[in-house]
A protein has these predicted regions:
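A short beta-loop-alpha structural element at the N-terminal edge
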Residues: 4-20
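A short helix-loop-beta-strand connector motif used in the catalytic cores of GNAT acetyltransferases and
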Residues: 41-51, 60-70, 88
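Active-site rim helix/loop that mediates acceptor-substrate recognition in acyltransferases
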Residues: 29-55
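Conserved acyl-donor/pantetheine-binding loop and adjacent beta-alpha core of acyl/acetyltransferases
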Residues: 63-91, 153
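Conserved GNAT acetyl-CoA-binding A-motif
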Residues: 115-128
Length: 202
């Protein structure tokens, strides 16, 4: 286990692109490989795109999107067809020597904190054919439940999973449904800053 003090989570930047692409495409069958153009596209559409640094080196990353993203993933499309609001974890990937070191749980805590004041559910998918028991165990023990299944064009089967975010109900009722309420900036600002209409507390 790596000590928490040695890990830094930060927003991605363009200089990280080649590193994260290599990490993604050398992660085995649980993560689908993509090309550089598709990875670069995430820089434009992902509200949450953070990397974990250890001693100045990128050790992993997590990408999450919300429904307005222009993204053609069949799993993202499935969630858009079934839920009007959500934060979708597209992928969380670590280098081989940093797997099962606690970085995934740090990422999960961070994206959960991001999601629960913005959307009512957090969603993702896990491969069930071939079966990814590491991811299934992780998400099931974090309170995710299966919302559906589908077979991808490549023939692989996935479990589509979601987790209700109870804190969002408070945000919606206290701030978003009241025109006179002021929502603190940290609860709506993100790397794309797509919600400027909400009033800001400096």
């Amino acid at each position: 286990m790596i000590s928490k003090q040695s890990i830094r989570l930060r927003d991605v930047n363009v200089a990280d692109l080649d590193t994260i692409l290599a990490i993604n495409n050398n992660s085995g069958e649980s993560i689908l490989p993509i090309d550089r153009a598709r990875m670069a596209r995430f820089l434009e559409i992902a509200r949450y795109f953070r990397v974990a640094e250890i001693n100045g080196q990128v050790a992993g990353f997590l990408i999450a999107l919300t429904p307005e993203a222009d993204y053609d993933s069949p799993n993202f499309t499935w969630f858009k067809a079934h839920y009007p609001e959500f934060v979708y974890i597209d992928r969380v990937v670590m280098t081989p020597d940093h797997r099962r070191s606690g970085i995934g749980r740090l990422f999960y805590a961070d994206v959960l904190s991001f999601a629960e004041v913005r959307q009512p559910i957090l969603v993702t998918e896990v491969f069930t054919q071939p079966r990814d028991d590491v991811s299934l165990l992780f998400f099931k023990t974090q309170g995710f439940v299966e919302a559906g299944e589908q077979t991808l064009p490549n023939g692989r089967r996935v479990s589509l999973m979601c987790k209700s975010l109870i804190p969002y109900a408070f945000v919606r009722e206290t701030y978003l449904s009241r025109p006179d309420a002021v929502l603190p900036a940290w609860a709506w600002q993100d790397r794309l800053n797509l919600r400027p209409k909400l009033k800001l507390i400096a």
